[in-house]
Amino acid sequence: MPRRREVPKREILPDPKFGDVDLAKFMNVIMQGGKKAVAERIIYGALEQIEKKNPGKDPLEAFHMAIGNIKPMVEVKSRRVGGANYQVPVEVRPVRRMALAMRWLKEAAKKRGEKSMSLRLANELMEATEGRGGAMKKRDEVHRMAEANKAFSHFRF
């Protein structure tokens, strides 16, 4: 059933330390069970690790660069045409692009072998700035799928 009006977007307040909205959004992605203080500790710990490993480099800049590298441009969506399902490549909206990048970054960091989550996240962020790592692998996989199914792009939604 369609909605009568568009649902307003919730405004996310910037994080307390850096005053960055994207970092606050990522904090919400990392957070589990409403434990924001834990998520805060993980993220700020990761940014401190980045600063320690690369003195003089702004950790917030590294975070934005990593997210920018992970963002997917295209993805595939299933479309049923004449009894067959086709994987149709579609462009990703900017808001979804950001959400996917953050989700993939979190998942890739979780799967790493380091001792603490903040260390895992720091290393994943550093690798993403260099164009490597699990999150980048995921993005490349999605791009490859879209490229492989380019022939079905005329089935756009």
From Swiss-Prot:
Keyword Ribosomal protein (UniProt): yes
SUPFAM superfamilies attached to this UniProt entry: Ribosomal protein S7
Keywords attached to this entry: Ribonucleoprotein, Ribosomal protein, RNA-binding, rRNA-binding, tRNA-binding
UniProt GO molecular function: rRNA binding; structural constituent of ribosome; tRNA binding
InterPro entries for this protein: Ribosomal_uS7, Ribosomal_uS7_bac/org-type, Ribosomal_uS7_CS, Ribosomal_uS7_dom, Ribosomal_uS7_dom_sf
Example GO biological process: translation
CDD domains: uS7_Bacteria (cd14869)
Keyword Membrane on entry: no
Summary of subunit composition and partner proteins: Part of the 30S ribosomal subunit. Contacts proteins S9 and S11.
Family, as annotated: Belongs to the universal ribosomal protein uS7 family.
HAMAP family referenced in this protein's UniProt entry, alphabetically: Ribosomal_uS7_B
UniProt cross-references to PANTHER family, sorted A to Z: RIBOSOMAL PROTEIN S7
Function: One of the primary rRNA binding proteins, it binds directly to 16S rRNA where it nucleates assembly of the head domain of the 30S subunit. Is located at the subunit interface close to the decoding center, probably blocks exit of the E-site tRNA.
Name used for this protein in its record: Small ribosomal subunit protein uS7
Native source species: Polaromonas naphthalenivorans (strain CJ2)
